[in-house]
Amino acid sequence: MNPSAPSYPMASLYVGDLHPDATEAMLYEKFSPAGPILSIRVCRDMITRRSLGYAYVNFQQPADAERALDTMNFDVIKGKPVRIMWSQRDPSLRKSGVGNIFIKNLDKSIDNKALYDTFSAFGNILSCKVVCDENGSKGYGFVHFETQEAAERAIEKMNGMLLNDRKVFVGRFKSRKEREAELGARAKEFTNVYIKNFGEDMDDERLKDLFGKFGPALSVKVMTDESGKSKGFGFVSFERHEDAQKAVDEMNGKELNGKQIYVGRAQKKVERQTELKRKFEQMKQDRITRYQGVNLYVKNLDDGIDDERLRKEFSPFGTITSAKVMMEGGRSKGFGFVCFSSPEEATKAVTEMNGRIVATKPLYVALAQRKEERQAHLTNQYMQRMASVRAVPNPVINPYQPAPPSGYFMAAIPQTQNRAAYYPPSQIAQLRPSPRWTAQGARPHPFQNMPGAIRPAAPRPPFSTMRPASSQVPRVMSTQRVANTSTQTMGPRPAAAAAAATPAVRTVPQYKYAAGVRNPQQHLNAQPQVTMQQPAVHVQGQEPLTASMLASAPPQEQKQMLGERLFPLIQAMHPTLAGKITGMLLEIDNSELLHMLESPESLRSKVDEAVAVLQAHQAKEAAQKAVNSATGVPTV
């Protein structure tokens, strides 16, 4: 060990180049002989949970960490040599460039260990890496010395030397900004000219004659294939920049043998790719800005609606620049886009058309979002809800959450103050008779706190008094851990019981329909008038659900009806997460939920997004626990 090495109070090591399947247990087994370990964390992608290829190992004593660094660097774990270095949490020290050198033109056989062994003679190395892709070494690497003096010695002694019979370049590391600045300066003084589109009959001599009038040329080359046939492009290298600039100015765009030739500054492949990428990003940003607030996403479209019909339905709200129904194999995919000329027109269309029945289905209309925006929005919503759950002393449980084998429940997300309190299915079973609701109209108290419901005149009893005195009812602990309980599947609501259980009062609707069937709960004693047969959502073992049935139900029952049909479908995809996902999806508009019940593809897409959000949250919690354990902060 090097006694002059700097002190690292955290005694934390960075372990890179890990095999994707390497786990914390494997790393513990590898590093524990060096000394007592506080914690190990393999860093993973928040969404996919796949290893990012590096980890942190925190020792109790810096001496143990240094021993591991000296004796275990480049040891093999699961067939891959790992790269170990001190964990430097201050990015300014890592990115300063002090002591960092760049080596290029390396032989393919040179790996991290060989590079380390070669340069360790010049001083203490903090990190060393040969850059690789899926095909192996890319021929260059970096060595970061502890001191600038060691780096300068390495440059002086090794630059131009042979390494595995190849002459290597060793120089000071330059940041991308520095390299781009140098590249820009060189570009202004270019002497090499690129010419293309001159046909197959051009050779070196003709090209030299064509460009020789602008000044003396160092070299002229027409690129050819194996048979000696011209590829249609070539290069001319002038002695002076002024001659090259004059050739570009005069020859670019001129006709040669009936073809318009291109003449410009010769660029390296990296330069061309960078410029193309910048142009593409600029075009993408311009397109996003142009359509911001004017492009609408329309789904739950009837199969008979085409581009013309879609344009016709939305044309009363303003000037439409484009209307497109997405097709697959000549059949509608059930969604499309309408682009207006101004944000005001688009906003008006969303307000008027969202929920309106066109043909046989209620439309879902919203401003179009990119996939990244939707996922970011969902993730943000979920994180906010979880934060509010932790703030609640006794969170209540989602009614669609089954009792998993582990005995852990996910607390329901508290909504606005007038939303219903959710209970576990076993509690709901205790609070009501075996049928869902009796013919006498008795309804359990927990649902009386939903929007639009009539609250009793008497003061509502406290939450604790509403819990039946039964040992079978689980107590909701602050840690969200409860005993394993049996769940009762909630069946469909019979029509007669629904009518008897619903008070004949005016309530605020949560769902919007066309004039013929809009707000039917304002006249609950009359039969809703539906002019055409509406498609019904069939879930095995349950009553078919149509848009008119949903509209005729009071607002507080609509989510319940949708949830009972969503839960078994989601349970078939993700049995252990069905309750959490159902609770998340019930936050979506009713029209979109109906469409998801009719379209398995749409449902699966939303379920996948919800799963991604859950995984991201779990990853964040796991990372927080790892940080807490490393710093000694107790976790709750």
UniProtKB/Swiss-Prot annotation:
Keywords, sorted A to Z: Acetylation, Cell projection, Cytoplasm, Methylation, mRNA processing, mRNA splicing, Nonsense-mediated mRNA decay, Nucleus, Phosphoprotein, Repeat, RNA-binding, Spliceosome
Alphabetized CDD domains for the sequence: RRM1_I_PABPs, RRM2_I_PABPs, RRM3_I_PABPs, RRM4_I_PABPs
Gene3D superfamilies assigned to the protein according to its UniProt record, in alphabetical order: 3.30.70.330, c-terminal domain of poly(a) binding protein (1.10.1900.10)
Dimethylated arginine: residues carrying this PTM: R493
Domain PABC: 542-619
Omega-N-methylated arginine carried by residues: R455, R460
N6-acetyllysine: residues carrying this PTM: K512
One Pfam short name: RRM_1
Modified residues (N-acetylmethionine): M1
Residues recorded as bearing N6-methyllysine in the entry: K299
Role summary: Binds the poly(A) tail of mRNA, including that of its own transcript, and regulates processes of mRNA metabolism such as pre-mRNA splicing and mRNA stability. Its function in translational initiation regulation can either be enhanced by PAIP1 or repressed by PAIP2. Can probably bind to cytoplasmic RNA sequences other than poly(A) in vivo. Binds to N6-methyladenosine (m6A)-containing mRNAs and contributes to MYC stability by binding to m6A-containing MYC mRNAs. Involved in translationally coupled mRNA turnover.
SMART domains registered for this protein in UniProt: PolyA, RRM, RRM_1
Residue numbers of Omega-N-methylarginine PTMs: R385, R419, R432, R436, R475, R481, R493, R506, R518
This protein's name: Polyadenylate-binding protein 1
Organism expressing this protein natively: Pongo abelii (Sumatran orangutan)
